[in-house]
Amino acid sequence: MRCFMRQVSWRSGKGYKQVDIMPIPIEGIHRGARGKRRHASSLVQQRLNGKHSRRYLVQLVNANFGAGDWLLTLTYAPEYLPASFEEACRRMENFIDRLRAACKRAGLPAPAYIWMTEGGTEEAEAAGEAKRYHHHAFLRCALDARAITELWCTGRGKHRRPLGRVHLSLAQPEQGSLEAWADYCIKTKHCRRKWRQSIGLKKPVVTVNDSKYTRRAIERAVRTGEAYSPQFWEKAHPGWRCKSIRVEYNEYQRGYYVRLEFWRERNTP
């Protein structure tokens, strides 16, 4: 099968990008020298499973969150466990509403977030089995940790009670905490999961280039071992540090598929 090599880059802000180099069949495909930049699809449009889910989540959080933002896990005390997945999602939505209201009262910017509800399976729910629903979130909010924790509650005034525990940590992008947290959030493959994100989040910028590499050049790099060297790819992407390399052979298209991740200092232009 005749193929050309396409490079697709997803850039998230100034400090992170993912690059795929892949064989594309020539027949029936419009080939351009360099495609114009466009934005990646929203979370709703992504197939939220496995590799696709993890990759887009990493792209999105790196485009919108950074040092000083919060990584949250919210759990339930036994007496407040939701009876259904839908109830758990409503409680998380109520928590976000309380965050917005608290920020507005304090004259602070509205919070930016990506949150997800996890727990149980449809089969377990139908059987009436216990489900340990919980929530994960990426959060940019000017409230302090104590104020955020106190909003994970039910009731008002003297009847106000905490729903469960709130685990908070500060994001450290240079240490890979955003990527690690994304992996942790989608670690369980068989539980139910629902995503929400705040309006106005920046989308990763996608760039397509069909002329940067030839099939022969990629095959030579794999054969000589250069394709597995971070320094080889860093020369092609000045100013970026290659943090992961994955090379696979596509039997159907008879070509190599290269997947790269790059990082650089956030204050780099």
Residue ranges and their predicted role:
Residues 1-131, 141-269:
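Right-hand nucleic-acid polymerase module
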